[in-house]
Swiss-Prot record:
Transmembrane annotation, as ranges: 23-43, 48-68, 79-99, 116-136, 148-168, 203-223, 246-266, 269-289, 323-343, 362-382, 441-461
Cellular localization per UniProt: Cell membrane
Known catalytic reactions: L-ornithine(in) + L-arginine(out) = L-ornithine(out) + L-arginine(in)
InterPro entries: Na/H_Antiport_NhaC-like_C, NhaC_Na-H+_Antiporter
Gene: arcD
Name of a matching Pfam family: Na_H_antiporter
Originating species: Halobacterium salinarum (strain ATCC 29341 / DSM 671 / R1)
PANTHER family xref list: MALATE-2H(+)/NA(+)-LACTATE ANTIPORTER, MALATE-2H(+)_NA(+)-LACTATE ANTIPORTER
Protein transport in keyword set: no
The protein's name: Arginine/ornithine antiporter ArcD
GO biological process, alphabetically ordered: amino acid transport
Protein keywords: Amino-acid transport, Antiport, Cell membrane, Membrane, Plasmid, Transmembrane, Transmembrane helix, Transport
Gene Ontology cellular component annotations, sorted alphabetically: plasma membrane
């Protein structure tokens, strides 16, 4: 994790620092470019992002007096901040292709179709995703491995893919924010200056409430899918299983890459070596069990899979881009990080945060502003780390002013910053999840209940005072939670 500390409002030269109205100009420009480019012209996001970078750079250079070197430094710092996510993107795309070719994902799909029904599948997909993400501390790894298999099972059972994807994402992001192994959990507690376990305990009320509501909704939707006739027929399921069994050797040994990857993650190994071990072990399984040649196995990891199972649905589900397919995603991430770096380096984000904080006059208002911060930063910078660090550093004094304990701040950052990542189409998380699960962001968004409910609940808690952690020299944060009004 890269150390990053944003500059405060006072750190910027008043001669260069934009006014509030000026700070909104590049934001309005970027929104306009994205809307026109993607919605009206049907372009990929890379071109509108390029327009936004040029527009913001010209304003900052000739309107506010920043040098080209200062702007480039801002871009460089932002990209360095996002390098961890970029490296993980590279390796997860290799992991997905290798696990498909090794038979790992086909094995899970085959036996999932054997035992699951539409009535129980949707809530079970969310619950299983939550358990795995909590255990390994990674939403991306869970979605890029288990999640793909679950989408395949859901499609075989006749469950709409957006519903399955929404349930998976609810599980993986709730597990990610709650896991003490997650980098975002460590980051939120660190930037808020609170003990890690106080932070984890502080999120329990939100996790339980949002989790129960989400599971109930998924159970209802699963039952509706079954009774509404959208569930797959026995003949369709048998056809899919036949296609899988006829193409792959489905020995239990094909689960070895999964066991190695998750085992290393649970033991505390960083994401890159854990995922790398998963790729190398899957290549070995492809060669030894699926009968691939050495060069063939590694070429598939690079260029992706395109199985011919005789079943179109299975062919589509198991077609992957490999390392080569990650380039499209990473160019979007680079573009979004670049414009986010300019916005941070020129004081745009600090000016907006400073002026917003001046309108606060209550604990509820402080919580609302703090909650909006990560949502806005996630949209503007496309980086989950920045969505936690920038609002955390910016609004820490504001939370202190209203005697809010750091645990309240860290919880708000997680309940909005972590879970909102896959809700934004050009954010690194949104781009990856849409690509990996094969479902556009705007299609799964209505079913991503954790992402919708978590920010709402944390704001309600701020205005009602329920389970808000207040500073008290006589009590610990968890004790003050029991007495807060």
């Amino acid at each position: 994790m890269v150390e990053f500390e944003p500059r405060s409002y006072e750190d910027f030269d008043p001669e260069k620092r934009p006014s509030f109205g000026q700070a909104l100009l590049p934001i309005a420009g970027m929104i306009t470019f994205l809307a026109v480019g993607i919605v009206l012209l049907g372009l990929d996001a890379q071109m509108p992002l390029l327009w936004g970078i040029a527009f913001t750079g010209v304003i900052a250079r000739y309107g506010w007096g920043y040098t080209w070197d200062e702007l480039f430094d801002g871009i460089s710092n932002s990209i360095v901040m996002g390098l961890g996510a970029i490296f993980i993107l590279f390796i997860i795309y290799m992991l997905i292709a290798s696990w498909v070719d090794a038979g790992t994902i086909p094995f899970i799909m085959y036996w999932g179709l054997e035992f699951l029904t539409p009535a129980v599948f949707v809530p079970l997909a969310a619950l299983l995703s939550f358990v795995v993400a909590t255990a390994i501390g990674s939403s991306w790894t869970t979605a890029g491995s288990l999640g793909i298999a679950l989408v395949g099972i859901g499609s075989g059972l006749g469950i709409p893919a957006p519903l399955t994807a929404g349930a998976i994402l609810s599980g993986v992001y709730m597990g990610d924010k709650q896991s003490p192994l997650s980098d975002t959990t460590l980051l939120a507690s660190g930037v808020s200056d609170v003990d890690l376990w106080d932070h984890v305990r502080g999120m329990f009320p939100n996790t339980i409430i949002v989790g129960v509501i989400s599971l109930a909704l998924y159970a209802v939707l699963g039952l509706m899918a079954e009774t509404g006739g959208t569930g797959g027929t026995g003949a369709e399921v048998a056809q899919i299983q036949g296609g899988l069994a006829g193409t792959y050797t489905l020995s239990v040994l094909v689960l070895l890459p999964l066991v190695i990857t998750f085992g290393l993650a649970i033991k505390g190994y960083p994401a890159l070596p854990s995922l790398g071990a998963g790729v190398f072990s899957a290549a070995g399984v492809s060669i030894l069990i699926q009968g691939r040649g050495f060069a063939e196995a590694w070429q598939i990891i690079y260029s992706g899979t395109g199985p011919k199972t005789g079943v179109d649905l299975v062919n589509n589900l198991l077609s992957t881009g490999g390392l080569e397919g990650s380039i499209w995603v990473i160019t979007i991430v680079f573009g979004a990080l670049s414009i986010g770096g300019i916005l941070e380096a020129t004081g745009v984000l600090s000016v907006i945060a400073h002026n917003t904080a001046k309108a606060v006059d209550s604990v509820g208002g402080a919580t609302l502003v703090t909650a909006l911060g990560p949502l806005v930063i996630n949209a503007l910078t496309a980086d989950q780390y920045m969505s936690i660090v920038i609002p955390g550093m910016t609004f820490r004094d504001l939370n202190d002013e209203y005697d809010l304990d750091g645990t309240s701040l860290s919880r708000t950052l997680e309940e909005t910053g972590t879970v909102s990542e896959p809700m934004i189409p050009w954010n690194s998380g949104g781009v990856f999840m849409a690509s990996a699960l094969g479902v556009p962001v705007l299609s799964y968004l209505p079913y991503y209940f954790v992402g919708i409910l978590s920010p709402i609940l944390v704001v309600i808690m701020g205005f009602t005072g329920w389970k808000m952690y207040m500073k008290d020299p006589e009590e610990s944060p968890e004790e003050s939670a029991d007495t807060a009004a």
